Amino acid sequence: MKTLPAITQRAVKPCLSPVAVWQMLLTRLLEQHYGLTINDTPFCNEAVIKEHIDAGITLADAVNFLVEKYELVRIDRKGFSWQEQSPYLRAADILRARQATGLLRQSRNNVVR
């Protein structure tokens, strides 16, 4: 009779560094919302990203500073509205980017019904 090991080994995903996470999210957010690449910004330099992280600056604040400084306009909003549409990123935009890049995993065990 053949025995199987009691513990099954799972594929372990390497843990991404905070800089790598920022790079993934910045790439997605800048392209989708402003039509830019990360190379169009100071964030193409990993040291700049690390400085922001070390200073406690949030991703949203970092991008929104660029929006204000360069008067960026969002390209992902269609049509016109009677209200002026804000060019700034919101928490929901970052959440959607986390989902799209696979950085946000939903656990069915943690869902409260």
UniProtKB/Swiss-Prot annotation:
InterPro entries: CbtA_toxin. Keywords: Toxin-antitoxin system. It holds the Pfam family CbtA_toxin. The keyword Cell membrane does not apply. Induction: Expressed in mid-log phase at lower levels than toxin relE. The keyword DNA repair does not apply. GO terms for biological process: negative regulation of cell growth. Disruption phenotype: Deletion of 3 type IV toxin genes (cbtA, ykfI, ypfJ) leads to a slight reduction in resistance to oxidative stress, has no effect on cell growth. Toxic component of a type IV toxin-antitoxin (TA) system. Acts as a toxin inhibitor that blocks cell division and cell elongation via FtsZ and possibly also MreB (although no interaction with MreB has been proven). Overexpression results in inhibition of growth in liquid cultures and a decrease in colony formation. These effects are overcome by concomitant expression of cognate antitoxin YafW, which leads to toxin loss by an unknown mechanism. Interacts with FtsZ but not MreB. Belongs to the CbtA/YkfI/YpjF toxin family. Encoded in prophage CP4-6. This is Toxin YkfI. It comes from Escherichia coli (strain K12). The lineage of its organism: Bacteria, Pseudomonadati, Pseudomonadota, Gammaproteobacteria, Enterobacterales.
